[in-house]
Swiss-Prot record:
Gene designation per UniProt: leuS
UniProt keyword Protease, yes or no: no
Motif 'HIGH' region per UniProt: ranges: 40-50
Motif extent ('KMSKS' region): 580-584
GO biological process: leucyl-tRNA aminoacylation
Protein family: Belongs to the class-I aminoacyl-tRNA synthetase family.
GO cellular component, one term: cytosol
Domain of life: Bacteria
UniProt name for this protein: Leucine--tRNA ligase
Length: 825
């Protein structure tokens, strides 16, 4: 019987869809399992990274269903974003039309893969029924003081006269017109994620099922540090600059202070000084550099003297105040004290600008000479030139000096975070409108919840230049003030797409609710997500924002959990020729081409077999062909044994021949391995490998055992369990094979089989016999022999007796159940 994957896959996809085979409802009598892959941006076509992500999730979903769980496995679309707007500018296609056309195509491709989604729960973030509730989320944060507006620097293209997202700035120039991009200070909306910094950090401990690397990335991004803020008075002005440092033990070694060029006080400090012009030129230069270009360790340190000096409150030293590229206003206070003797960055800057270097920490038993130093000393040592703290170990001096600073009123202890508030404003059209109306009398007024959604207008001119595209809509701009009724102006910014994706996992639980974003009882049943799957590139922003929003909703009483994802799997990339697939490299493999040539089951099997899920996967055409051949082998042997399966009775192990026992052992050993590999480790590659070994054993049994000696009951057991074990990996072929052996219903509705522990205890085992570490024989012995009895059998083997004749046996080393090594001279 020919394996006609084209007809088979179409047949079962149609049947699953018509019968809503994977639709699910809350059922308190069953244990729930929520498996979720990160939803895609609808770019137009699936790529192999998508196939890998969704195939992994589908194995988990199907396996859990077969283990009796009530499985929620939904899919949707992260549908707002810049590409749709660029399509409108370049091709004259409205973002809405472009997006929905792409969604239709990608949905079709997903169905081609046979992923077991509950399509009744499909969501798209660009649909008003969805972004109504994104706007509702904004209002909850706004009402509770967690959404606010302030001025912030944004990327600005002077040629396009528009704000650019970071993604639109490539090597410092606008990707559209290639003009040099600068910075502009504009009013922007923020979410106050910094209020949750410590909780987000502390609760990383709860994330037992997350990869360590992701947890470390989040810890570093939040970036908690303990230090002290100290005020350095500006000489000749009634003003001070506030320094934040985690190294107060070095404060007596400050020889200059650095302030960020964009710090709000800089303009006042330089005004009227001889350095004003050169400082302004430097400030303008810094505006055209991004954070990475300024702060990377390999970037040359640059700065200019402000013409001002500041006073170190601890020793009265008058030190110069510099602007420098490596200090950012967003971090700490935007001002740092420079101790070149004990900080490498400061050391390099001091050498470049011929600034003093003052040693205040000496290594034990040595004496540093500042004039001869070639690098900063950053290890633990003992304080010198530090007044009353001389002789104190530097790590012990930190706390003592902070106490002294507080006692003297020079400053105070401070915990700082690298994490900044979440800037959500986008001067874009294709995003969720921010539900705020500006009234000349009432100020910024939130749109009432009953008036949501604020719908995106359609009368938009997409030029790619000027202000937000929403400003071109005459129907959108004007709106009555919800407080006083006078005509006001709508907010023209839209929300960052990360806002939409920070709560979508909640909407899946209740996607058709038009009264609320979700029903609390349904959320209580399904949440948290048991298994989340996606790329490590989302380790920080998306996952951190989702955790933040969940904690806000928890604090407001809308949910009962404050962490959204119990377990996280970050799958590796799909590579070809050692590089990530990309059009520019010409190494892209189209999923549709593979499906057309080999079928979806082959594509899935290869992507799951070629590598553990968390590792990168190297594409191999030969590997794909090998997986196709394996499915054909399974297809042939199941169909050859189909009649025997239908005739097979109940298993009676007491009648087993030696060949029967070997096949029975292989079946149960495979069941154990596959179950453990899927449920405990997600090692799908080794699970598939185990099934391949079972298929080899089945072929051996078919070829070596005469037809009239074959145990039909055993064959039936092996074939049935083989099909069930393969079902999560190759769902279409196994449905067809299940039907071919005369079974009713779907294979995916079958109970996952358990193994028989007794079957894993062999009556006989094979022992490798070595002489001086080299294999010389293999013997079969009863499994219940003692160590001494096995060694005796090994020494009495005819081959071993011949090899050791005339030699002195020095000792015998045994590894129970595996080998005997005889050492001779």
């Amino acid at each position: 019987m020919y394996y006609n994957f084209v007809d088979i896959e179409k047949k079962w996809q149609k049947k699953w869809l018509e019968e809503k085979a994977f639709a699910v409802r809350e059922d308190e009598s069953k244990k729930k399992y929520y498996v979720l892959e990160m939803f895609p941006y609808p770019s137009g076509n699936l790529h192999m990274g998508h196939v890998r992500n969704y195939s992994i999730g589908d194995v988990v979903a199907r396996f859990k269903r077969m283990n009796g769980f009530n499985v929620l496995h939904p899919m949707g679309w992260d549908a707002f974003g810049l590409p749709a707007e660029n399509a409108a500018i370049k091709r004259g296609v409205h973002p809405n039309d472009w997006t929905w056309s792409n969604i239709d195509n990608m949905r079709r491709q997903l169905k081609q893969l046979g992923i077991s989604y509950d399509w009744d729960r499909e969501v798209a973030t660009c649909h008003p029924d969805y972004y109504k509730w994104t706007q509702w989320m904004f209002l909850q944060l706004y009402k509770n003081g967690l959404a606010y507006k302030k001025k912030a620097y944004v990327n600005w293209c002077p040629s396009c006269a528009t704000v650019l997202a970071n993604e639109q700035v490539v090597n410092g120039v606008c990707e559209r017109c290639k003009s040099v991009v600068g910075k502009k200070d504009l009013e922007q909306w923020f979410f106050k994620i910094t209020d949750y910094a410590q909780r987000l950090l502390d609760d990383i401990e709860k994330l037992k099922g997350w990869p360590d690397k992701v947890k470390v990335m989040q810890q570093n991004w939040i970036g908690r540090s303990e230090g002290v803020e100290v005020d350095f008075k500006v000489d000749g002005m009634d003003k001070a600059v506030r320094v934040y440092t985690t190294r107060p033990d070095t404060i007596y070694g400050v020889t200059y202070v650095v302030i960020a060029p964009e710090h709000p006080v800089v303009k006042e400090l330089i005004k009227g000084t001889e350095q004003e012009q050169v400082c302004n030129e430097f400030i303008n230069k810094m505006m055209f550099l991004n954070e990475i270009d300024r702060t990377a360790t390999d970037v040359e340190k640059e700065g200019v003297f402000t013409g001002r000096y500041v006073i170190n409150p601890l020793n009265g030293d008058r030190v110069p105040l510099y602007l420098a590229n490596y200090v950012l206003a967003e971090y700490g206070t935007g001002v740092v004290m420079a101790v070149p003797a004990h900080d490498q960055r400061d050391f390099e800057f001091a050498k470049k600008y011929n600034l003093p270097i003052k040693v205040v920490i000496q290594p034990e038993g040595q004496e540093l000479d500042a004039s001869r130093m070639t690098e900063a000393f950053v290890e633990v040592g003992y304080l010198v030139n530090s007044a009353e703290f001389d002789g104190v170990r530097s790590d012990e001096a930190i706390g003592k000096i902070i106490d002294y600073i507080e006692q003297k009123g020079y400053g105070k202890r401070k915990i700082n975070y690298r994490l900044r508030d979440w800037l959500i404003s986008r001067q874009r059209y294709w995003g969720a409108p921010i539900p705020i109306i500006y009234c000349d009398d009432c100020g910024a007024v939130p749109v009432p919840e009953e008036d949501l959604p604020v719908i995106l207008p359609t009368d938009i001119k997409f030029s790619g230049v000027g202000e937000s595209p929403l400003s071109t809509s005459e129907t959108f701009i004007s709106a009555p003030c919800p407080k006083c009724g006078k005509m006001g102006r709508r907010e023209l910014d839209t929300m960052d797409t990360f806002v939409c994706s920070s709560w979508y996992y909640l909407r899946y639980c209740d996607p058709c609710n038009d009264k609320a974003p979700f029903d609390k009882e349904r959320i209580r049943y399904w949440l948290p997500v048991d298994q989340y799957i996606g790329g490590v590139e989302h380790a920080i922003l998306h996952l951190l924002y989702s955790r933040f929003l969940m904690k806000v909703l928890y604090d407001l009483g809308y949910v009962d959990y404050d962490e959204p994802f119990t377990n996280l799997l970050t799958q590796g990339m799909v590579l070809k020729d050692g590089a990530k697939m990309s059009k520019s490299l010409g190494n892209v493999v189209s999923p549709e081409e593979i499906i057309e040539k080999y079928g979806a089951d082959t594509a899935r099997l290869f992507i799951l077999f070629a590598s553990p899920p968390e590792k990168d996967l190297e594409w191999s055409d030969q590997g794909v062909e090998g997986c196709y051949r394996f499915i054909n082998r399974v297809w042939r042997i199941v169909n050859e044994f189909a009649d025997a399966v239908k005739e097979g009775g109940n298993i009676d192990t007491s009648t087993f021949t030696k060949a029967d026992k070997e096949l029975w052992y292989m079946l149960n050993n495979t069941l154990k391995r596959v179950t453990d590999d899927i449920s405990q480790r997600f090692n799908f590659n080794t699970a598939i490998s185990a099934v391949m070994e079972l298929v080899n054993s089945l072929y051996y049994y078919k070829d070596k055992v005469a037809d009239d000696s074959k145990n039909k009951a055993l064959v039936r057991e092996v074939i049935e369990k083989l099909i069930i074990m393969l079902a999560p990996f190759i769902p279409h072929a196994t449905e067809e094979l299940w039907s071919a052996i005369g079974k009713e219903g779907s294979v995916h509705e079958q109970k996952w089989p358990s193994f028989d522990p007794a079957a894993l205890v062999k009556d006989e085992i094979e022992i490798v016999v070595q002489i001086n570490g080299k294999v010389r024989d293999k013997i079969v012995v009863p499994s219940d022999l003692t160590k001494e009895q096995v060694e005796e059998r090994a020494l009495n083997s005819e081959k071993i007796k011949a090899e050791t004749a005339g030699k002195n046996v020095v000792k015998v080393i045994s590894v129970p159940g595996k080998l005997v090594n005889i050492v001779v001279k």
